[in-house]
Each structure stands twice: as C-alpha cells, then as structure tokens.
Amino acid sequence: MRDVETARDASSGRSEQDKGRRPGRLLAAFKAFSLLAVVAATVFGLMTNGLYDDGILWLWLPVSAVVLALLFVAVLTRGFFEDVPREGWVLVALLAALVLVKGLSMVWTISETETINETLRSATYLGAFALTLAVNVAVPRLGWALVATLAVLLAAYWETPYRWMLLLMMLAAVIGTSAFSRRSTPEEERTGSLVDGLCLPVAAVAGYGLLQKIYPDRYAIGSIDDYRVGSTLGYPNTAAVVLGMGALLALSRMTTLRNPLLRGLYAVLLLGSLLTLYLTLSRGGIWSFGVGLGVLFVLGSGRLQMVANLLLVSVPGAWLWWRMQGLGALLSAEAPMGEKVADGLSLRNDLILAFIVAFALQAVYAYLASRYELTDVSRRLLGIAAGVGAAIAAAVSGWIVVAGSGGGVLNNPDAGGTAAQRLVTLGIGFRADYWRVGWEAWLERPLTGTGAGTFQYTWLENRPSVQGVKQIHNLYLEQGTETGLFAFLAFLAFVVFLVAFTARAAWRRRPDGEGRLLLSGLVAAVVVYLVSSAVEWHWYLPAATLFFFILAAAAARLARAGDPPKALADDHTAG
C-alpha cells in the first residue's frame, strides 16, 4: 500500500513538474517565433527594394503591423522581457523617448501624413529591437536556413498578394520554432547561429548584384545612373552598407569556425560581398566598411588569423579586379548592351574560377591550422610581415587609383567620370545644400523642429535650385531638423551608449574564446551603418534599418552575457 502511495506521489510530482515546464516551453516557442518572424520579414524586405516604395505604404505597412502586434502580445506575456539586461532597458528607453517625441510632433508638424508615417516607422524599429533583445532561445543553422531561404524565394517569385507572403513567412517561423528552437545553449552559440542566418540574405544581395553585371539584359540595374549596382535594394549606397556589414560578419564568423567546409563557404561570401561592394561604387559605403574593419581589428582577437583570411581572399580578388580592368563596359552607362553582355559573360567565367580558388585556399588553410600550431615567435614575425605587406598593398592600390583619377579628388561626384575618379572624389555633391537648409531650419525651431518626416517640405521652401529631395542625407541632423533638440539628444545618446557599451564589453572579454571576436564583428557591423548614416538616408529603407537593429540587439545581449565560466568555455571549445 505504501508502494502504491509512493508511486502515486511520484506520478503526481511528475505531473506538477510537467505543468511547471509547459509555460517555459510555450514562452520559448513564442520567443523563437517572434525572432524568426522579424528576421523573415527583414529578409523579405532586403529582397524587395528594402520595403521602400515612394509614396506607397503597402510595401512596409504590413511588416510594421506584424512587428507591433508581436510587441503588443510580448508586453502582455509574463516573463517575455525578464532576461533583458539593464543596459538593454536603457537603450529601449532612449528609443522609446525618440518615438514619443516624434509622436508628439503631430501637435506642431507641417505635414500630419508624413509625421504619422515616420512615427510608425520608428515604432517598428523600436519593436524589432526590443523583441530581438528579449529573445534568449537558440535556432540552429538549419532553422535559419529554412526561414531565410523561403523568404528569399518568396521575394524572388512572388505573384500572390502581399498579405499571403507574410502568412507564409509566419508559417516558416512556426516550423522553425517547433522543430529547431532550443533554450539551454550559451549566448555565444545562439548569437553565432543568428549571424549564420543573417549572412544568408547578404549572400542573396551580393549574388543578385553580381547577376546585374553578368546578365545586364535580364537583370536590369534600377539605380539612377544605370551602372552602379543597387542589387535587390535598388539604392547602391544602402546596398553597399548591407554588403559591408555582411562582409565584416563573415570575416569575424569564419575566423571563429574550425570546419573547413563552412570556412570555405564564408570565404566565397566574403569575396562576393567585397566584389559587389566595389561594383556599387559607393564611396560612403566603402569608407564606412573601412572604418568598421578598423574597429574589428582593434577590438577583436585572432588578428593574425583575420589577416590570413583577408590575404587568402585577396589573392583571387586581386586577380579578379585585374581582369575587370579590361572589361570597360561593366562600369560604363554609355556602353552598348552587346558589349555589356559580352563583358558580363567574361566576368562570369572569371568569377567562377575566383570563387573556387577562394574556397579551396580557405579550406586548406583551415585544415592545416587545425592540425598545426605556430610558435609565439612565428606568430610575431608573421604578424609583422602581414602588417607590412598590407601597408604596402594599401599604398600601391591608393597610388594606382589616385593616379587614374586624373586629379579630380575634390570634384563633385555627381558630375560623372570613371569609376576610379568617383571612388577617390571627396566632394559631397548636393548634400552640402541639404545640410545647410536643414541646419537653418533647425535654428529657427531648435526645440520642436518642423515635425517628423517633413524635411521634403522644408527643402521645397528653401531650396537654392529646382532639384527635389525628400531626405536630408544625414540621420543625426535630421532628428534635430524635424523633431528638435530632445529627439536629437535621445538618438545621439542611443548611438553613443550602444557603441560604448558593446565596444567596452568586447575589449574586456577574454581573447581565448570565440565570444570576443563574434561580438567585435557585431560592433563593427553596427559602426558601418552608423557612420554611413551621417551622409545617407538608410533610415527610410526599413529592411536595411531592421537589419541594423537586429544586429544591435544581438550585440547588446552578447555584451551583457560576459565570458562563460572557464570550464564551460573549454568544454564548448573541445566539443
């Protein structure tokens, strides 16, 4: 009888334990669902003009509704935000203050419609950032591959109404949640899987950009000048920023991996991203990538390996660039279509060979690095040799480009010229007029501004020419011009706190684990967006900005996680 009671008590205990576990599993599933849905919508947007369509809301409004609906449900769900770090709440509060000021600007705005649009856009970014920041469940690579691939395919071949696209992406998120979500994994592993998933749409952006040059008759370039690659985003400068962010993520991620196959694939992605970045001819994007690369080398560990990875990719990359110099129609708007098609086919053949070489070099290097280890003296000598070689290569490349620019370094980039002349031009073009008009408007209304999203009307009233423009091409000045001092300070505080917090955490981490390098890659990618936004209007292409906020939230979570215990780190590395 006593045995029966004991068995009954044990059964009852298991039942109570299962009941206690069920809410945890449901919460983990909902968190994974939320993150997958946000990422799926972002990937779809990166494939469809960045969710931007001039004057039409249907491209990004459904995504905004989904993100805000998920945020509303998350707020009502107990325990959803319990793992958000203190620093994360500070960042959320600063973004919320920015959204609040933009909403209040409805009282004094000169255009209610534009203010509503901008407030809704900013609220969507806040929602995506908060949701990503709260998610502490892991989705392995297979789950990310499922969701990202389906989103890319739907964007490429969609013929059904937009709402069905979102429903199908939600289905993908549900599948990924039920099949792959895990909670009891280290933060580094969760973030690594997220980075792997986000590199897939970057590969799609790079691939489509290359197709625009390989098959120009089938994949037309939609940019204004008809020869700068805009890829699926349609705007070359924003495409360059996404590619630069992806290249830094690929470089940092491949350095943390040991699998030769994965490292070879990342080498192909890195080469493709850098080549497409060059074909955008975006000075701001390329220089922002350079700044981010410097941040990565300053904060990251394994610098010698990163230099080796870059050198291995630069071997086929330099050969490919040399071959492209004889394909003049690639970067010429006036070239006949027949010449463009012929040069595109030549580029295709060279590109296939370069990708094979990049994959093979990285795979062989990864195999050798896993079997042999250099001594400290050899590392030091190789580091010095690599640094000197990189400096010489940079100096020679700079001299070649400047020599080919014809001395037009300070010319207006809008005046045309060759690709080399455009890349070395320091002029800011019409942006000087945009900034002057915006600054004068801010001085007239320093506390309130003219209303969120209303710069186009300020420009129409004060423009010195007949040229039309909607954005001020400076995200920071735009906050002050449109919504006054308080919005400017809120956004500036968000940027400074985000970069300082994550960079400090990366610098203080142990160099022996993969967490420092992974966090440094995220910080570098975030810096690329923030630096480029000083001369561009990426904020108004929701998909690119959602991509940024997902990375920013991942960096904040990883920064707060800190180093794992030494024994756990050793076990994870050994496994």
Where are these regions (language model features)?
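Membrane-interface alpha helices of multi-pass inner-membrane proteins
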Residues: 150-155, 268-281, 528-534
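TM-adjacent membrane-interface loops and short helices in multi-pass inner/ER membrane proteins
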Residues: 235, 417-470, 476-479, 483-490
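Transmembrane signal-anchor hairpin modules in multi-pass inner-membrane enzymes, especially those
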Residues: 1-104, 110-117, 127-199, 253-267, ...
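Membrane-interface segments at transmembrane-helix junctions in multi-pass inner-membrane proteins
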Residues: 218-249, 253, 332-354, 475-479
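Hydrophobic transmembrane alpha-helices and their immediate junctions
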Residues: 265, 485-520
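Aromatic-rich transmembrane-lumenal/periplasmic boundary elements in polytopic membrane proteins
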Residues: 208-219, 395-444, 448
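Membrane helix-loop boundary segments at the extracytoplasmic
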Residues: 43-53, 480-483, 517-549
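Transmembrane-embedded, aromatic-rich helix segments that form part
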Residues: 241-242, 285-295, 488-493
